[in-house]
Amino acid sequence: MNSLYIDRKNLSLQHQKDALLVFDGEHRCATIPLRLLERIIIASQVQISANTLGKLGSMGIGVMVLCGYQ
């Protein structure tokens, strides 16, 4: 997996050690090893902390945020 596309609303992204955790409310939807990712494309309303963005950047993982007009 090189690219992770996120298009579901109201998810939150967190990191724990070298994994990206995807939550829908309190429920963890996915755990993805960061070593598998080159980029993350976000195409919906997602919550992500500066700490997690920093971890992604330190591992060379790009983050692209797409904004569509409604």
Predicted regions and their residues:
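N-terminal intrinsically disordered, cationic/polar leader segments
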Residues: 1-70
